[in-house]
Amino acid sequence: MSSHSKQALPAITVAAIGVVFGDIGTSPLYALKEIFNGHHPIPVTPENILGVLSLVFWAIIVLVTIKYVAIIMRADNRGEGGSLALLALVTERAKNPRLSWIITLLGIFAAALFYGDSMITPAISVLSAVEGLEIITPDLKSYVIPITLGILTGLFFIQKHGTGAVGKLFGPVMVAWFGILAILGLKEIAYNPAVLLALNPLFAIVFVAEHTGLAFLALGSVVLAVTGGEALYTDMGHFGRFPIRLAWFGFVMPALVLNYFGQGALLLIEPEAIASPFFHLAPDWALIPMVGLATAATVIASQAVISGAFSVARQSIQMGLLPRMQIIHTSGMEEGQIYVPFTNWSLYLAVIALVIGFKNSSNLAAAYGIAVTGTMLIDTILVAFVMVLMWKWNKLLVALVAGTLLLVDIAFFAANAIKIPEGGWFPLAMGLVSFTVLTTWRRGRRMVSEEMAKQSIPMSDFLQSIDDVHRIYGTAIFMTSAKDGVPPALLHNLKHNQVLHERVVLVTVQTTDTPTVNDMERIYLHRMQKGFMRLIVRYGFMESPDIPGALELCKGHGERFDMMETTFYLSRETIVPSMARGMLPWRARLFAVMSKNATSASDFFHIPTNRVVELGTQLVI
């Protein structure tokens, strides 16, 4: 590590604490409370308290520390993490088409579950913090939901302005949060150090063996202690592997463990504190500041999830899983700071509906977990493929490591499945809707490409037929998704105007399996006959296409483009659903609606609107 990197490391680590660990860092607000006082409460006995604490501790060790920090964070896609980055990494190396198809569906479903999860996290986090007002005085109970709705509304309304300015406070606030978590827990452990016996895995094993039914019910809520663990991998591209690991081992994990064990120590002495063990750790004089700090921490956790949803939306668009949407860059300095209006308002409506419909954090906890455990299960399957295809691990070792992690994931997923009638149906339903949208768009675009390929003619035949066509001054650029053949917009233009520009460029944008593409590898320019050339522009799945910027790079290849002498011809497809094609009628209609409402190509590719000619074409699918 360079001296410059060493100097920057503390700042990066603090910034990572502010973004990466918000979700898992606010879990102490409700995790133990839900285990002992939720929809499937465990009796508050010393034996059960120690058994549950042991389960929580070893869940953090196995699912977060070993699985994500030690193993999955090694599977980065040029520094980027997350289910879609992992999907791109695996499909790039899967030679078997059927295997590649299965892996792709798994990755898409993981992304779909993430959308379901991202609706619940802001609702349960902020609501659980504001519920601390009830501890101060029960008279404030009626204000909890209005205050929560007000905070969430403010949070979603400021997204379009970006969070760069206030984002600088996220790290220090979360450092203070984790520091207080540790202090409150340590204070209570000092009164009852016997609680540390639960660090021994035998307590978890005995609890599971002697109270199998209770342990199974407990697992459904124990998972609340590890929700957000997947964010360590998802946010790796923003901060790097080492700062996240340093923050986890050096500060965040010890603070979480101390707080959970502090709550356990409190319950051993005062079982009646189970109504809100987290806030009962604080002295009476500190309750109001604690509610304020907890609310700030949950807002930061929610912001991280919202930003993650924007990032996944952009990845999905680039990977051909969603139609073009408006993507606004909210920072001139940071490429990753974006705002996706459709995603923002969809999440907002869902989050508000959840708060109003479920009414308290305990009810929401029943809905939480199923999406997270589903995502974790899929991540384990995908990383098993990475172990075989990329790391070339011995298959016996893969079976041992991945098999053990799969068993743990399946146990947690099964325990959460019993919560489906109580609220778990919501993230699953939202995940299913998202999965349907993602796969419908992917399938529809493939059918459109196939239909356009049928209607196209070979470039060689076209070039031979244009000798007598009148050529006019200037440059015409035709955007096309096909790497060969003649774009429909070019044929339509020639048919109606009977002329061609003296220079014609066919531009195809490709998305790679990597998060970014170096400018040296951005473009491929192929000169053909009679003033025609084909330009391939490559972008990573974390980048936003910029065609004028790509044309600037052509200077290095001897081609210059003057925007005032250049006309962009774009094809606007009108989709006509058909009963006779390879898609169910309702899905064809859904695809047609998505296609109609997609952001215009000129906006998405940053093409000057005063230089655009749009030509319509009708396609039957």
Swiss-Prot record:
Q: Does the keyword Transmembrane apply?
A: yes
What is a single cellular component term in the Gene Ontology annotation?
plasma membrane
Question: A Gene Ontology molecular-function term?
Answer: potassium ion transmembrane transporter activity
Instruction: Give each disulfide bond as a residue pair.
Output: none
Q: Which reaction does it catalyse?
A: K(+)(in) + H(+)(in) = K(+)(out) + H(+)(out)
Principal localization? Answer: membrane
Q: What does this protein do?
A: Transport of potassium into the cell. Likely operates as a K(+):H(+) symporter.
Q: Which family does it belong to?
A: Belongs to the HAK/KUP transporter (TC 2.A.72) family.
Its name, as the record gives it, is Probable potassium transport system protein Kup 2
The species is: Dechloromonas aromatica (strain RCB)
